[in-house]
Amino acid sequence: MATFRSEFNSVPNTYNQRLTALKKKLTTCFQQWRQQLLKLHQQQQQPKQQQQQQQHQSQHQHQQQKQKQRGSEHFYNIFVRADCSILSEKVTYLRKFKRIFTARQNLASARTAATAASAKQPVLGRCIGQEEQQLQIVASLFSSTLISKHSSSASITSSSMTIMDNTYIGVRDEYPDIDTEIRSILLANAQNGITISSIKKEYRQLTGTAFPLHDNITDFLLTIPHVTAECCESGKRIFNIKPTEHTRHLHEMILQQRQRDSVSNPIQAQEPPRLWRAQYKRRIPQHFNFNLNTSEKPPAVKISKLQPLATAAAMSNDVYQDNWKHLNNQYQLPQLNAPKNNIHSHIASNPAQLQAALPAEHHPSKHVEEYAHKRRHEYTRTPTTLSCPSTQHDSMFTINSDYDAYLLDFPLLGDDFFLYLARMELKCRFKKFEKVLQSGLCISGQTINAARQRLRLVELPEMTQIIVNIGSEDIMRGRSLVQIEHDFRLLVKEMHNRRFVPVLTTLAPLANCRHDKQTCDKVSRFNKFIRSEGRHLKVIDIHSCLINENGIVRFDCFQNGPRSVTGSSEPYVFWNKIGRQRVLHMIEENLEYY
């Protein structure tokens, strides 16, 4: 968007040099005219001590009137003889101005020198008032394009171009808080600015009343201090506000916020990406030389009822594109030909046996029919294969279970954050037939105490390094910090008793609790406790990779909104693809085998 901004306050710099020269001449003439009127008014108010002084004063006034007429004639020569061809759209205003100027000269010529001295003061005061009113009328006609507002004490050499706000005194008297309300609207939209129509709409939502002005809204907005205007290529005027000392912190906070994606239809925003099923089609071993797409026949069976996990997923209305993959295994076919499927599933899970079995097969069409009856989820990648394509992450699982959350040989222990990290990046699968999503030692809504109870039942080799990231659920439930720290110490002690090696990680920032200072302080203090508790252990600082150098949370590493989880009543704002990759990279950089 091509924009331009005036070097003066609140006025777009869009006029050529000829118009600028004319404006300067008009401004100088009006200043001289007004100063002469003020001097004349001050002289009329001085006490008249002697008649000679009154006569001398009348002569002096007569000379001042002559000088004023000369100044007016000089102004007339400047104004009438000026080349106004560039002001084609202002012809109506120029005509009105000439009529006012002619009426003013006729009024000056109608004065008689024989008027009594006692009658001169009200007449002169009335004339001065009329001339002041004429100046205000002319200023309102030319608005922000020709006339600049100058106070009586302003310097003649001043050239600041602003708009006279005397016209909108009535509006501000009727709506005393309108300037503050408009400034708050502009400050809330400081990232990209806001148009007049949007200002009207937000003003109605904020106050419950319609915007009081219908004409000259641009001029009115520019009378508000620190308001600026820009113009884009399409011609729309974009308004914004400059920060002050009191609002600079709010202005910087708004500029650092994530920009919302403009979606015209909220229903379309919840739809999955187009042709998303094609990304998760059945994986066929690449060792076969035949094409299953030409010979595969769909099974002639009805789809079974949804499992409890699928039912819970179907009832949820919130859909996030980067978490859509977990629905891949929700809709399953009944287990037909169980012995055959089990045999082929066992062969497919062991690539060495699969390669040994291939030379002995002589009827590929038979295998095509058998693989056509395999369930959909049996073709998806399991932890025994590469977790991601070569373009993503290259970690490999060495665990035989299809459900445990592992990073290489390191089991993960945590709540929803590690659970979805394992599902989305490491391709671990949720345990079937469970209402609460879980994978290995990662369970949705798991607290520290629940993790300690579950750790007693797990069977793992001694000296197994377990990556621990837990405590967010306890903090979101509002538990006291000392109780959380006590449970965490018991968890570490239980791992030592089982001869496991804990790899501690700090808690990530809770994106949906950043407004709560008490919660943020509790997260910071708990992370400090983890570093102190793990001074003799390995501690991975996940929190540092999700904040910038100024300590501000990287909201571009989080999803756009909170999401309800199956194991907790508290919603979570999960990490998006960027955040998960940053966390995974941080963990792998600090891992090593003993």
UniProtKB/Swiss-Prot annotation:
Pfam families: OSK (PF17182), OST-HTH (PF12872). This is Maternal effect protein oskar. InterPro entries: LOTUS-like, OSK, OST-HTH/LOTUS_dom, SGNH_hydro_sf. Residues 44-68 are annotated as: Disordered. Posterior pole of the oocyte. Transmembrane segments: none annotated. SUPFAM superfamilies: SGNH hydrolase. It comes from Drosophila virilis. It comes from the Eukaryota. Residues 174-243 form the HTH OST-type domain. The keyword Glycosyltransferase does not apply. Residues 44-62 have a biased composition (Low complexity). Interacts with smaug (smg).
